[in-house]
Amino acid sequence: MKSLKELSLRIKNIRSVQKTTKIMQMVSAAKLLQSQKKLLNSKLYVSKLHNIIFSLMLSVDQELLAKILNVSNDGSYLVFIIASDRGLCGNFNSSIVKFSQERVNKSIANGKKVDIVFLGKKAFDVGKNRFDSKSILKIENSKGITLKHVEALVDGIDLSKYDKVKVFYSKFYNTFTQKPMLETIKPWSKDSSLIDSSLAGPTTDYGYEYEPQNIEFILKSLVQDYVVIALYSALLESATSENSARMVAMESANRNTKEILNKLALLYNRSRQAAITTDLIEVIGGAESL
């Protein structure tokens, strides 16, 4: 049995850890509320933009539409993998890397050239040796990236040389549910995991008046804008999922430390009682020998 001094020191250390996890849980809860508000605004915007693009496409013939979307199965892919810069959030980082690894390596095995951009230090640390791609870029502080940063990032990449641009991210459903998701943001698709149909409104041709009166120019511009907005929205989804995962992980850690402290307190009291009993026996034994 451990000494009272050892047990006392261990209880002190675990209480210190418990204070840290409680603070981290509170901070994560506050960040979760903030990121949820940003995510809702972003989801509203991307849903409306997606709906406008689809509505405009209703008035475009298929030949022009194919030209605007530039759909092709050849060439190369650009893949964004979004995770976190920090740990202590359960399997948040490992799950998105595992999810993307299977799909990216399958594309490479099928002869596709895939360039990878890791948005988040942990995504790079976990996944840098798991992908068969030789072209890998790492961008840290993904959760702090603003819309301007995303615009600069996209502007710095020649998207025209990629037939497909894909985003792997963690979709936020609720506090306890976040799932790895794959979203293709180029070419534009009618189906999207980033939009909320209840926010987008009805899909119909509203009879827009175009300025300039060149629907091809307008659609190309909107589709390019959609790539930026969709990537930014995916970043917000992942940031919200990360904060939620960390809050839940810290809550679980708090419960575990509480259970450990209860067990240690019980063990400490038993050890203390045993020590007192031993001392009493020695005192009584000494008195009887007199």
Swiss-Prot record:
Membrane topology field: Peripheral membrane protein
Localization (cell): Cell membrane
Stretch forming the signal peptide: none
UniProt-listed InterPro entries: ATP_synth_F1_ATPase_gsu, ATP_synth_F1_gsu
Pfam families noted in UniProt: ATP-synt
Alphabetical keyword list: ATP synthesis, Cell membrane, CF(1), Hydrogen ion transport, Ion transport, Membrane, Transport
A biological process term (GO) from this entry: proton motive force-driven plasma membrane ATP synthesis
CDD domains: F1-ATPase_gamma (cd12151)
An example Gene Ontology molecular-function term: ATP binding
Keyword Transport: yes
Subunit structure: F-type ATPases have 2 components, CF(1) - the catalytic core - and CF(0) - the membrane proton channel. CF(1) has five subunits: alpha(3), beta(3), gamma(1), delta(1), epsilon(1). CF(0) has three main subunits: a, b and c.
Function: Produces ATP from ADP in the presence of a proton gradient across the membrane. The gamma chain is believed to be important in regulating ATPase activity and the flow of protons through the CF(0) complex.
Family statement: Belongs to the ATPase gamma chain family.
Protein name in UniProt: ATP synthase gamma chain
Gene responsible for this protein: atpG
